[in-house]
Amino acid sequence: MEERDDIITLLDEEGKEQDFEVIMTLEVEGNEYAILAPVDSDEDEDAYVFKIVYENEDEYSLVTIEDDEEYDNVVAAYETLMDEEM
């Protein structure tokens, strides 16, 4: 199987691996975020937002956004970028 740079594998709540396509990374208020969509999903509306936290130059973690205001700001920035592309 060909490995693609825009596909990453994450573990779900049950410890099962799931592949995600990196739709976009964006910066909002000095923080970096990733918009991911499940590779095996047929629905266009399934997307997840994660905050990118760098451990060092080569390592990072994707963490869920707990703060509603932060999440809303990232979604608004993403939607604005998508509207501009259309």
Curated annotation (Swiss-Prot):
It comes from the Bacteria. Disulfide bonds: none annotated. PANTHER family: UPF0473 PROTEIN CBO2561/CLC_2432 (PTHR40066), UPF0473 PROTEIN CBO2561_CLC_2432 (PTHR40066:SF1). Belongs to the UPF0473 family. This is UPF0473 protein Clos_1662. It comes from Alkaliphilus oremlandii (strain OhILAs).
